[in-house]
Amino acid sequence: MSMFCFQCQETAKGTGCILSGVCGKTPEVANMQDLLLFVVRGIAVYNQALRKDGRSSARADKFIFDALFTTITNANFDKHAIIKKIKKGLELKKDLSNQVTIEHAPDECTWYGDETEFEEKAQTVGVLRTSDEDIRSLKELVHYGIKGMAAYVEHAYNLGYENPEIFAFMQYALAELTREDITVDELITLTLATGNHGVQAMAQLDTANTSHYGNPEISEVNIGVRNNPGILVSGHDLKDIEELLQQTEGTGIDIYTHSEMLPAHYYPQLKKYKHLVGNYGNAWWKQKEEFESFNGPILFTTNCIVPPRPNATYKDRIYTTGATGLEGATYIPERKDGKQKDFSVIIEHARRCQPPVAIESGKIVGGFAHAQVIALADKVVEAVKSGAIRKFFVMAGCDGRMKSRSYYTEFAEKLPADTVILTAGCAKYRYNKLPLGDINGIPRVLDAGQCNDSYSLAIIAMKLQEVFGLKDINDLPIVYNIAWYEQKAVIVLLALLALGVKKIHLGPTLPAFLSPNVKQVLIDNFGIGGISTADEDIAKFLA
């Protein structure tokens, strides 16, 4: 059975996974994800038509962003769960089709089939359905941007925040991707519009998070352990960890964060829980080793899951929820009737487990989102004016397995002492435990939070632009050296481009889905570049 996927940075040979995913997904899972996306595009066409006369389906809105999230790298490896979503999507599409007529409807709208036909159909609707290399490249760039946007939309939705304009754009974009006559120029316009709406989606999530949990504040986070049973929470969904904290309060069970959930410790309304005791481990890709010693159950609220080895001792301790899935793991169902998710099964499991084994000790500092940094604006501005801070380096983004990512550790270590790193996302784990010191009390690594908190870094940049009276954001002493891995990094990139940021450097490699011509458009119009060596790049950036 064949597959084709090149949506992540680690795609095989830098061109595409064709036998199995480097991420661990099988061809069956990859193909069912392709078919799910195909069904989603059809639903989007119908719902977009219904929206024009005020009859759009809220059920379709939710299905679309949840299904898109399901197909993000490392989110869902459960073929049966994905097939179930496809069947649900076909039923939803049929219901919508009975409410509106689409002239010259694309195959995405007209195809229906049962499970026996899914695999055969999936072979015809994936990335390679588009023969023109540049059209394919731009279509997938938009696709991946929309996937990343869907993740941020879902997190905001879980906190009660919806923006019909974002729903409408996502579905408009998906409908446009069904067109066989779409041009390169139209797709470039659509790509830029995706970036603009990515800014809106990140702003909405920032509002949702801060209105519920307060503005992130400077916080010390323990990276050791206590002598109580624990639950390890991975992923990004703050609503999930909040409800788990509430349901475990007073039980004697400690809650630890993992990877991208680290910033939960920065929010006042989450850090108030005394049994939110620390962060365990490092970036997502080290979980095969680190989960062995945690001893307690692990909850994946979103990506990033790495399928465990067959002999892993923690296999029966994995729980998934939301858009995530892993065959053999226990799934925590969605909320119903306005009630919380029921985490009792994972809580009872934790009671039977030994406490985690320490793999490191000490503390790390974070919480430098836009409100906190702007509160320190006078201090920061003075440091820049006095020359104490020569340059800021935005090193936000994702971490990953490739050995070449040691570049980011070396880069951080070799930066001069008069520079400051602004970070968000799990890329931080390459350098957030290094003894890099501070500048006049300002830590040299300022962690804003999760990957979506790259929005905070953009807000900080715009505030500095205002303070220094600069017409162009690119005149600031800021260098963008971003590590990417999956589709949320794609929407962050497109959002930064929409905000006018240029000369962004992406690594450790440029995306495989960018054709040579599309890559050249990004270079010519936005100054997008790659990386070389830490020494060469530092010399170039400081010249």
From Swiss-Prot:
Q: Name one GO biological process term.
A: response to hydrogen peroxide
What keywords does the record list, in alphabetical order?
4Fe-4S, Cytoplasm, Iron, Iron-sulfur, Metal-binding, Oxidoreductase
The family database entries (InterPro entries) matched by this protein are listed as: HCP/CODH, Hydroxylam_reduct, Prismane-like_a/b-sand, Prismane-like_sf, Prismane_a-bundle
GO annotation, cellular component aspect = cytoplasm
GO molecular-function term, one example from the UniProt record = hydroxylamine reductase activity
Co-factor binding details: Binds 1 [4Fe-4S] cluster.
Which Enzyme Commission number(s) are listed?
1.7.99.1
Biological role: Catalyzes the reduction of hydroxylamine to form NH(3) and H(2)O.
List the HAMAP family hit by this protein, alphabetically. Hydroxylam_reduct
**Name of the protein described by the UniProt record:** Hydroxylamine reductase
Q: Which organism is it from?
A: Bacteroides fragilis (strain ATCC 25285 / DSM 2151 / CCUG 4856 / JCM 11019 / LMG 10263 / NCTC 9343 / Onslow / VPI 2553 / EN-2)
Q: Which gene encodes it?
A: hcp
